[in-house]
Amino acid sequence: MTNTILRLPVVLTERGRSRSSHYQDIKEGLFTHPVQIGLRAVGWPANEVMEINSARIAGKSEAEIRVLVKKLEADRKAA
């Protein structure tokens, strides 16, 4: 597995969401928080974007996606 970090424009394209919808999803626990990659730069681990997209494609409920998001963020801290 690679540790690629995707910047916002790529994440929005991958998700098919607008910027405001993306940040609303983060606020509602439906997407992971970004990681700091510079003083004024953030990004998202590619594997997290892929896992959340796969869950949506599989028809997972919002509650199931919230559980996945919590797991992904906990895994970050454990790494």
Where are these regions (language model features)?
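Short Lys/Arg-enriched helix C-cap and helix-to-coil transition segments
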Residues: 35-41
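Polyanion-binding surface elements
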Residues: 1-28, 51-58
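A short, Lys/Arg-enriched interface patch at domain edges and termini
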Residues: 50-78
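Short, solvent-exposed alpha-helical "recognition" segments
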Residues: 28-35, 61
